[in-house]
Amino acid sequence: LLISPTASGKSLMIYSLVRYYVDKGQKILLVVPTTSLVEQMYKDFEDYGWDAESYCHKIYSGREKDSSAPVTITTWQSIYKLERSWFEDYNVVIGDEAHLFKSKSLISIMTKLHHAKYRFGFTGTLDGTQTHKWVLEGVFGPSYKVTRTDELMKQGHLSQLDIQCLVLKHKPQTFETYNDEIEYLISHEQRNKFIQNLTLDLKGNTLVLFARVEAH
């Protein structure tokens, strides 16, 4: 299980593993959490100069499950209910963004891959719970940190960050539901004015991210 943050080259690491095991005549199952990542991984392989169309088969949204291609790129949702026999030909399994897999589904897939001697999990982060770490290490093996975000910043691969957390204090109030409390916060005039003024006072370009678009 390789823990490596954003912009650390996870796609290139995965590509290198795939090319290595394809050259060794192995059949590879590459599992990702979303449909968009299936296409992104396929495109990354093409961008690295590989003839992905000749070597890779994509599975998602009801696509054909069976293929003779040496590499299958799929979402975990597309395969976790398949019979054990479907998994028998795979010698290598690679899980990208492994922290986003549901534990039961991941275990279901990995236990069916009893012929997969080589198992690699990639993630930028763990969710902070020891149980989740144990589940991932149980199916992929021991975890190793490839690098850290601060190291990438020192090396100039990532932008230098200055993170400041601002906490706005409100008078204590009681709400019947969680949604009532959220509604109070996002419609609070002074709070929104503070965010507005802060945004306008900052130099350069500013990106403001928020949830509940309609409410704002």
What residue spans do the PLM features occupy?
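Conserved RecA-like helicase motor-core motifs
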Residues: Y42, G49-E64, L207
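Conserved interdomain hinge at the start of the Helicase C-terminal
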Residues: V18, T174-E214
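Conserved Walker A/P-loop ATP-binding site and its immediately adjacent core
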Residues: S8-D47, R212-H216
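Conserved helix/coil segment N-terminal to the catalytic DExD/H
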Residues: S61-V92, S103-S108
